[in-house]
């Protein structure tokens, strides 16, 4: 499938999430404390190279960044299915994935779901494997049925934010160079999906 057609198949909610990520990520950066190295529109040089881009990252096109976000951070981890169930939870997962890798928010979602099923009374535990597949989506749909769409969304966003904050605190505690990024992560990544979006 050609890349333009693939992106054209993105839902309006997915495109809005990508636009929000661009707003947070900004343009070109090359912070010596960032192990990701040269980054443009939130895409690291290594990821750009995986997608066939060989030019200077200062010239990395926004259109290719959109495609990278859609393929690597929405389609591959299965977050397109999550966006269909709850755009706000989908945004939380995709945004977190861009910053921490897509497996990490998948695990946070799975841990949150397992903690909310009342010891399996509402739905079975899911395997915490970092792959948000059909069992994870079924568990989230069950949580929606039990708690209502808005409340399920608020509960998951809160628990994913809490885990993300803990992740950043561990990174900064283990490696003081990451402290450079803590203010930005705290301002732009924790609580950046307003609970009002769950309504």
Regions found by a protein language model. Give the residues of each.
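Cell-wall polysaccharide-cleaving catalytic domain and substrate-binding groove, primarily
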Residues: 2-199
């Amino acid at each position: 499938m050609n890349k333009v057609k693939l992106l054209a198949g993105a839902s309006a909610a997915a495109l809005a999430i990508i636009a929000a990520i661009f707003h947070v990520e900004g343009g070109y950066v090359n912070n010596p404390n960032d192990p990701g190295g040269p980054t443009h529109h939130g895409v690291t040089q290594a990821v750009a190279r995986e997608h066939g881009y060989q030019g200077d990252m200062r010239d990395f096109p926004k259109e290719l960044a959109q495609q990278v976000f859609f393929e690597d951070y929405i389609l591959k981890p299965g977050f397109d299915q999550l966006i269909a169930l709850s755009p706000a939870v989908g945004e939380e997962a995709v945004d977190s994935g861009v910053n921490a890798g897509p497996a990490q928010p998948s695990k946070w979602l799975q841990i949150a779901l397992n903690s909310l099923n009342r010891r399996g009374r509402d739905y079975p535990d899911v395997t915490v494997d970092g792959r948000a597949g059909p069992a994870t989506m079924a568990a989230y749909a069950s949580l929606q049925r039990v708690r209502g769409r808005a409340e399920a969304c608020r509960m998951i966003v809160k628990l994913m934010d809490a885990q993300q904050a803990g992740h950043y605190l561990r990174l900064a505690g283990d490696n003081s160079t990451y402290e450079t990024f803590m203010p930005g992560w705290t301002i732009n990544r924790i609580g950046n999906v307003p609970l009002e979006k769950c309504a």
